[in-house]
Amino acid sequence: MAKTAAALHILVKEEKLALDLLEQIKNGADFGKLAKKHSICPSGKRGGDLGEFRQGQMVPAFDKVVFSCPVLEPTGPLHTQFGYHIIKVLYRN
């Protein structure tokens, strides 16, 4: 059976902005509010919520991080062809 996970993410074009957002989140800023304000991904409108997805559904670099990083700990920035991601895994099965 395939592994599944649920995650939030913020996607931006600039690494500097991603680093700044990660620092804000680690200092207590609301992930969802920052996603709504800054994310260029359509999921930003939902606070960065990607919902539940199966391992292998996302681009390989994103998939690798989601299925290996600590749950509920903001991680990043991760660079993909889409830009820079800040990721927060909500759960993994």
Swiss-Prot record:
It catalyses: [protein]-peptidylproline (omega=180) = [protein]-peptidylproline (omega=0). Residues 2-91 form the PpiC domain. Its EC number is 5.2.1.8. It holds the Pfam family Rotamase_3. Signal peptide: none annotated. SUPFAM superfamilies: FKBP-like. Keywords: Cytoplasm, Isomerase, Rotamase. Not inhibited by cyclosporin A or FK506. It is found in: Cytoplasm. It is an enzyme of class 5 (isomerase). Its main location: cytoplasm. InterPro entries: PPIase_dom_sf, PPIase_PpiC, PPIase_PpiC_CS, PpiC/parvulin_rotamase. PROSITE patterns: PPIC_PPIASE_1 (PS01096), PPIC_PPIASE_2 (PS50198). It comes from the Bacteria. GO terms for molecular function: peptidyl-prolyl cis-trans isomerase activity. GO terms for cellular component: cytoplasm. PPIases accelerate the folding of proteins. It prefers amino acid residues with hydrophobic side chains like leucine and phenylalanine in the P1 position of the peptides substrates. Belongs to the PpiC/parvulin rotamase family. NCBIfam families: PRK15441.1. This is Peptidyl-prolyl cis-trans isomerase C. It comes from Escherichia coli (strain K12). The lineage of its organism: Bacteria, Pseudomonadati, Pseudomonadota, Gammaproteobacteria, Enterobacterales.
